[in-house]
Swiss-Prot record:
InterPro entries: 4Fe4S_Fe-S-bd, 4Fe4S_Fe_S_CS, ETF-QO/FixX_C, Fd_FixX. The lineage of its organism: Bacteria, Pseudomonadati, Pseudomonadota, Alphaproteobacteria, Hyphomicrobiales. It comes from Rhizobium meliloti (strain 1021) (Ensifer meliloti). This is Ferredoxin-like protein. Keywords: Electron transport, Iron, Iron-sulfur, Metal-binding, Nitrogen fixation, Plasmid, Transport. Could be a 3Fe-4S cluster-containing protein. The keyword Electron transport applies. SUPFAM superfamilies: 4Fe-4S ferredoxins (SSF54862). The keyword Chloroplast does not apply. The gene is fixX. Residues 57-87 form the 4Fe-4S ferredoxin-type domain. GO terms for molecular function: iron ion binding; iron-sulfur cluster binding. To ferredoxins from P.putida and C.tartarivorum, ferredoxin I from A.vinelandii, ferredoxin II from D.desulfuricans.
Length: 98
């Protein structure tokens, strides 16, 4: 009989390495008075938890742990809430297992 092993996403993410390009984030959130529904959704659906709602009700991004999966582009590209570009060569996520 095999024993099921529960794996957490946090354990997998911990294996990745990130080379941060200090002062040049590849993701920025457009200034807003109140966040759109898509920006609010990013606080829940970003797999790396890069988006947070701050104390003033604004959505902020911390791009340091970004997996470059494109979830934010899919949700916010149409309305322009997020500006996303690829990190410069050699920077960004370095996947441990491919």
């Amino acid at each position: 009989m095999k024993t099921a092993i529960a794996e957490r996403i946090e354990d997998k993410l911990y294996q990745n390495r990130y080379l941060v390009d200090a002062g040049r984030p590849h993701i920025t959130v457009r200034p807003h008075r109140s966040p759109s529904l898509n920006l609010l959704a990013l606080t829940r659906v970003c797999p790396a938890k890069c988006y947070e709602l701050n104390e003033t009700g604004q959505v902020e991004v911390t791009a340091d742990g970004c997996m470059e999966c494109g979830t934010c582009r899919v949700l916010c590209e149409a309305n322009g809430d997020v500006e996303w570009s690829y990190p410069r060569g050699g920077f960004g996520v370095l996947f441990k297992f491919g």
